[in-house]
């Protein structure tokens, strides 16, 4: 994907604030979810649109200060994701939460990375999305 400087910054911010800041693996997992959402008709079609969507990512994700000393994993992961790299265990998952959170709703968990648990929501396309990727509507 060819991304603008602003789109790259939005992706870096999502990775920085949502994953363990020292974890390339966690950053890749968050970046994979962001890109899965960008590619889905159910979410905004831009990285900044996805990351800035109300109550979907950390509060203030697009405005809070980042510590330059802790940005390296997110910067490297963002560049990898923008070149087509994806976390191999996240697959088509479009959702995650802190691994310590006890989700009261059914979910198909696919991996834990960077302090987050990544999952698919149940539904008629659950198995298809996990095995084949998101279905075309």
Regions found by a protein language model. Name each.
Residues 1-137:
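Bacterial extracytoplasmic/cell-wall-associated proteins, especially those involved in peptidoglycan
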């Amino acid at each position: 994907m060819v991304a603008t400087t602003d789109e790259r910054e939005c992706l870096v911010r999502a990775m920085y604030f949502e994953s363990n800041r020292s974890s390339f693996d966690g950053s890749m997992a968050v970046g994979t979810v962001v890109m899965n959402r960008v590619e889905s008709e159910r979410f905004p079609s831009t990285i900044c649109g996805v990351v800035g969507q109300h109550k979907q990512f950390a509060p203030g994700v697009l405005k809070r200060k980042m510590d330059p000393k802790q940005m390296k994993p997110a910067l490297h992961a963002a560049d990898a994701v923008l070149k087509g790299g994806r976390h191999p265990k996240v697959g088509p998952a479009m959702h995650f939460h802190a691994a310590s959170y006890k989700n009261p709703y059914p979910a198909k968990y696919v991996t834990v990375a960077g302090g987050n648990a990544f999952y698919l929501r149940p539904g008629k396309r659950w198995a298809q999305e996990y095995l084949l990727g998101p279905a075309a509507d």
